[in-house]
Amino acid sequence: MQENLKNDKLKIGKYEFDSRFILGSGKYSLELIKSAIEEAKAQIITLALRRANTGEIANILDYIPKNITLLPNTSGARNADEALRIARLSRELGCGELIKIEVISDSRYLLPDNYETIKACELLAKEGFTPLPYMHADLYAARAMRDAGAAAIMPLAAPIGSNKGLCAKEFIQILLNEIDLPIIVDAGIGSPSQACEAMQMGVSAVMVNTAIAEAKDIALMAKAFSLAVNAGRAAFLAGLASVSKAKASSPLTGFLRD
């Protein structure tokens, strides 16, 4: 089993990673990003292009180690066309082909627009991007995104930034059952135990931002999440015991009646 864990790779399109923990970068002070990455042992970090400007705000790219794979997102896009424009800008900045599609036109609940996201998947795939759509867990939408060229599906666990955990657990399980692509849980994970639970379900990876960025000790919380993700993955591979009724762990021999 140890050998299985060593060879257990996260595969997204043509890319392979040893770590199944994806780190968000949206709420950190720039000085803490590097330490969070190191403690998380993450190999992928998401990046909002609005934080990668070269103006008065320090460029976040200067704080991310060069061996880390960037996953730029289209945060701020309200429709598929805006997502495409942001993705093209990402490519011009040298951020590569991986792109997390975020299309949100709702400013109150910040829920992703699955319909526009499907359109964005098709547009970006045609231009050679490797799209990872952030979506509200829905089987029909996930199928459409897969058919449009998505390399992975990123359903939210709960509303973004809420830390409420696996509110969409049953719907995510349906995606696991029916979609033959990596399922990466994104948004709403608020504690290491919730990340572990998601990995035990069999999801391919977990992305966390707010729960780490708002912790009192960011680096330590990043480490805690990393350990939890690894533990959950190991438990899934080991095969969790499941029974529908009580079963004694020791034989009931009736020796007290002898």
UniProtKB/Swiss-Prot annotation:
Keyword Cell inner membrane: no
Active site annotation, chain numbering: 100
Protein residues bound to 1-deoxy-D-xylulose 5-phosphate: 161, 187-188, 209-210
Keyword terms, alphabetized: Cytoplasm, Schiff base, Thiamine biosynthesis, Transferase
Subcellular localization, as worded in the UniProt entry: Cytoplasm
Pathway field: Cofactor biosynthesis; thiamine diphosphate biosynthesis
Gene Ontology MF annotations: thiazole synthase activity
CC terms in the record's Gene Ontology section: cytoplasm
Lineage top rank: taxon: Bacteria
Primary location recorded for the protein, binned into one broad class: cytoplasm
One GO BP: thiamine diphosphate biosynthetic process
Catalysed reactions listed for this entry: [ThiS sulfur-carrier protein]-C-terminal-Gly-aminoethanethioate + 2-iminoacetate + 1-deoxy-D-xylulose 5-phosphate = [ThiS sulfur-carrier protein]-C-terminal Gly-Gly + 2-[(2R,5Z)-2-carboxy-4-methylthiazol-5(2H)-ylidene]ethyl phosphate + 2 H2O + H(+)
EC number(s) per entry: 2.8.1.10
HAMAP family: ThiG
Subunit details: Homotetramer. Forms heterodimers with either ThiH or ThiS.
Family recorded in the similarity comment: Belongs to the ThiG family.
Function: Catalyzes the rearrangement of 1-deoxy-D-xylulose 5-phosphate (DXP) to produce the thiazole phosphate moiety of thiamine. Sulfur is provided by the thiocarboxylate moiety of the carrier protein ThiS. In vitro, sulfur can be provided by H(2)S.
Protein name as catalogued: Thiazole synthase
Protein source organism: Campylobacter jejuni subsp. jejuni serotype O:23/36 (strain 81-176)
